[in-house]
Amino acid sequence: MSGAYRQDLNWLVSDFTARVPDVAHAAVISADGVPLSLSDGIPPYFAEQLAAITSGLASLMQGAARIFEAGLPTQGLVEMEGGLMIIKAISDGSSLCVLAAPDCDTELVAYEMSVLVEAAGEVLSPALRGASPGGMTPPSMGGRRPPISPLQGAAAKTAAPPSRW
């Protein structure tokens, strides 16, 4: 993975996670699985995994929409026991991915995602990848990676931590 994400745009998604209740992490991912911007607290190795999963799910959503002749997909939701993964299309195949607590207000989260995409869609477009500085290198741990609780950030912002993450 090239790891060419826009560190100077991370504040957009970090601000989103700070403002929206029960949201732990957010990332903007290109169609080809490259993290374009990341919220605070996402380790590099987790960003790579999240990017691959997000681009894969976005591709599946696009394939389903094509087969069912249902127009372009705008949003997808993966509901798990320990939390939600919400994916929203931005432009040119890029996506905003949000990890939230299982009992979050999904309507509020989806609304805030739409506001972010509308307000910052051009800024977050994949065309900026070519100008991206630096890269990410996963930590060296002898082949092991520490477990991450994807929603640990949500627990710090809410009175009661999410049920599982």
Where are these regions (language model features)?
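Acidic, low-complexity cytosolic segments
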Residues: 1-23, 32-165
